[in-house]
Swiss-Prot record:
The gene is phaC. Its EC number is 2.3.1.-. This is Poly(3-hydroxyalkanoate) polymerase subunit PhaC. Heterodimer with PhaE. Disruption phenotype: Depletion of both phaC and phaE genes leads to complete loss of the PHA synthase activity. It comes from Haloarcula hispanica (strain ATCC 33960 / DSM 4426 / JCM 8911 / NBRC 102182 / NCIMB 2187 / VKM B-1755).
Length: 474
């Protein structure tokens, strides 16, 4: 038996003591509650100085001013090739510039990059018929041309976030000559039971985006906000407010909480027709990943994406799980791809302290290593009414190879030439397609040639046009 038997009087006293302590804490907290709420309402966001250098309809193209920000970068460390950030059509882009120490924009500026950002702003009822073609081939293309003209560069770097990343893929596939590198941040690209709850909710079995647009015209931000919040209802409606109450005495915590709440409550409507296209073509039919997507009759051909590609994804992203992004690298032509999966969530990629300490310096370096800058060119940017622009030809540089070749290496190359080339030596056949082909007994290029496009498309689970592209290379 226990040497300390249960004492009901002591237990009652302990309970009363604990209750009194909790009441005292609550009373003290209530005394500062009004002050903390005022502090939350007074926080500022998006404070990095910028200039609007181009406007069209509602959109504004921002150019960030490192000098006005107080960021000093040595002349030799300044990058010639600028970065254009393409944000989603949902929410405001200042999540990428939330506060000084958690600003993606500032991290890039500090690394010497010249940074631009497209702020789409909110569409009116007059914009409900804007399509993805309008956003990608008109608005984005005009912004890219402005950045090219201002920088004197024939091709620029792009960084697309979330839906903006998906649209950046579309743009790059259609205008590859204008894109030096493509960075994608939590971009939804592959929806084959890989997109988590959002993909299931958006399934044509349960949801009709056309019905929403027929009812509202543009998709209301309140409807979108509630939908996103309900993906994690306990956290969004209970836990975070308990956490706020427990940390109310911490001014820094309250300020950060206020900034995030301001952004979460600052949603914008989405143009109706673009929303329908995005949900039906990208989510429900997975046309982008299958290389079947068309914008206004133009094929968004993933084989055109042959420049360096970087993918950033959050390990705990419940909006765009890593599995909705990773497979994309296998279906593009680029042989310079990199994937970074960081231990954070969808929003954490842009605002968590750990990403700013460890991830964004690495991203800035990735862009720097691939942004040597080409010959400056003069670019004519047409007025917003025009959909096309004159394009300058890229500069071709010939490099002479050395005549000194190691004899052993030459012999090794000769031996290798005698071996049948594997199917993954064909441009456009990445690891995923190669694995499917291998499983069907197709290991070499010679094996591949024994099949027609329809048979290969069925085996590799791709389109006949892509399979025919493989055969055309043989």
């Amino acid at each position: 038996m226990s040497s300390n038997p249960f004492n009901p009087f002591e237990a009652a006293l302990n309970w009363q003591r604990k209750t009194l302590e909790n009441m005292t804490d609550a009373a003290e907290t209530s005394q500062i509650a009004d002050e903390r709420l005022e502090l939350m309402e007074s926080v500022e966001v998006g404070q990095t100085p910028s200039d609007v250098v181009y406007e069209e309809n509602k959109l504004e193209l921002l150019h960030y001013d490192a000098e006005a920000t107080g960021i000093e970068v040595a002349e030799e460390d300044k990058e010639a090739v600028p970065i254009l950030i393409v944000y989603a059509l949902i929410n405001r882009p200042y999540i990428l510039d939330l506060q000084e120490e958690r600003s993606v924009v500032r991290r890039l500026l500090e690394a010497g990059h010249d940074v631009y950002l497209i702020d789409w702003n909110e569409p009116s009822r007059l914009d409900q018929h804007l399509t993805l073609d309008d956003y990608v081939n008109r608005y984005m293309d005009n912004c890219v041309d402005v950045v090219r003209e201002r920088s004197g560069q024939d091709a620029i770097n792009i960084l697309g976030y979330c839906m903006g990343g998906t649209m950046s893929v579309m743009y790059t596939a259609l205008h590859k000559e204008k894109v030096n590198t493509l960075g994608l941040m939590a971009a939804g690209l592959c929806f084959d039971h890989t997109g988590g709850v959002l993909e299931e909710w958006g399934s044509e079995e349960y949801y009709s985006p056309q019905d929403v647009v027929d009812t509202f015209g543009n998709v209301p931000s309140d409807m979108l906000d509630i939908g996103f919040a309900l993906m994690d209802p306990v956290e969004n409606y209970v836990t975070k407010y308990i956490r706020f109450a427990e940390n109310m005495e911490n001014e820094g915590f309250v300020e950060n909480f206020g900034r995030m709440e301001q952004w979460l409550g600052d949603g914008i409507d989405v143009a109706g027709e673009a929303y329908v296209q995005f949900l039906e073509d990208v989510y429900q039919d997975n046309k982008l990943y299958k290389n079947e997507l068309e914008l206004n009759g133009k094929h968004v051909d993933l084989d055109n994406i042959d420049m360096p590609v970087l993918q950033l994804m959050g390990e705990y992203d419940h909006l765009i799980p890593p599995e909705a992004s990773k497979p994309f690298n296998d279906v593009i032509a680029s042989d310079d791809t990199r994937t970074i999966e960081f231990s954070t969530g969808h929003i954490g990629l842009s605002v968590s302290s750990s990403t700013h300490a460890d991830l964004w310096p690495e991203v800035a370096e990735w862009y720097s290593e691939r942004s040597t800058g080409g010959e400056e060119v003069d670019i004519e940017v047409e007025s917003p009414e025009d959909d096309t622009v004159d394009q300058s030809e890229s500069t071709d540089i010939e490099v002479d190879a050395t005549d000194d070749v190691d004899a052993d290496a030459t012999e090794d190359d000769a031996d290798a030439a005698d071996e049948p080339a594997d199917v993954d030596s064909v441009s456009g056949i990445g690891p995923t397609y190669a694995e499917r082909l291998h499983a069907a007994g197709i290991h070499s290029v010679a094996d591949l040639a024994e099949y027609d496009a329809a048979e290969l498309a069925d085996i590799a689970e791709t389109t006949e046009s892509r399979a025919q592209d493989w055969l055309d290379q043989l």
